[in-house]
């Protein structure tokens, strides 16, 4: 594969922290921490123990992925050497908004949350995006396009009942006051300004 012929590090469009490729050795532990954004975690290799309200004591294996909503507490422990991608977002970039809104309207809390399994399309996407992320600082505009593609691959290639359970944490959270606070706290300087937003 050819390498990028431009140096994106100096470009104002360069960005980090939206799609993140991570590798950790067995035993690496991340104590419980509140998610400041929604995230989808894709396991590429190894096993990762996840502990959260939605996925208590759940072992994620290669090819599986889960969603954690903004405000949820997430703890991670690498049971083996692990390789995974995290996608951080507030509002998902949508190509097919109608289907996404239909999914959210029909979403219901599952008795137990089950990780989704990557389709071949998502597996191929992950291989390509990891090669790209490992090269150098990513281009923000390109990452935005890839995130649209990724959400399209999730929203349009899985059955709606599966997706309505998968996205339930977002649908329930976006209706809450805490979500309103998290989405707006950077926009205001004091409580009085905050009151005017409501």
Segments the model singles out, each with a brief description of its role:
Residues 5-8, 49, 55-57, 114:
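Hydrophobic alpha-helices of bacterial signal-transduction systems
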Residues 100-153, 161, 179:
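Amphipathic alpha-helical segments enriched in hydrophobic/aromatic residues interleaved with Lys/Arg
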Residues 13-107:
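N-terminal regulatory/effector-sensing and dimerization cores
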Residues 50, 154-158, 181:
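Hydrophobic recognition helices of helix-based DNA-binding modules
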Residues 44, 155, 182-186:
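Short, locally clustered residues in the helix-turn-helix/winged-helix DNA-binding domain
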Residues 118-131, 147, 164-189, 193-198:
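A short, Lys/Arg-enriched amphipathic alpha-helix from helix-turn-helix/homeodomain DNA-binding modules
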Residues 28, 158-166:
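Short, Lys/Arg-enriched N-terminal segment that forms or immediately precedes the first helix
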């Amino acid at each position: 594969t050819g390498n990028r012929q431009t140096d994106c590090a100096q470009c104002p469009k360069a960005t980090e922290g939206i799609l993140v490729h991570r590798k950790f050795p067995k035993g690496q532990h991340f104590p419980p921490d509140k998610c400041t954004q929604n995230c989808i975690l894709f396991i590429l290799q190894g096993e990762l123990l996840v502990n959260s309200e939605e996925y208590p004591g759940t072992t994620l294996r290669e090819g599986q992925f889960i969603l954690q909503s903004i405000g949820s507490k997430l703890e991670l422990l690498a049971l083996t050497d692990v390789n995974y991608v995290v996608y951080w977002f507030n509002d998902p970039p949508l190509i097919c908004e109608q289907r996404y809104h239909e999914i959210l309207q029909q979403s219901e809390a599952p008795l137990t949350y089950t990780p989704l399994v990557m389709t071949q399309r998502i597996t191929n996407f992950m291989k390509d995006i990891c090669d790209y992320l490992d090269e150098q600082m990513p281009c923000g505009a390109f990452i935005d396009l890839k995130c649209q593609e990724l959400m399209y691959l999730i929203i349009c290639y899985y059955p709606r009942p599966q997706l309505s359970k998968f996205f339930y944490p977002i649908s329930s959270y976006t209706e809450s006051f805490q979500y309103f606070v998290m989405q707006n706290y950077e926009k205001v300087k004091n409580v009085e300004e905050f009151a005017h937003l409501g």
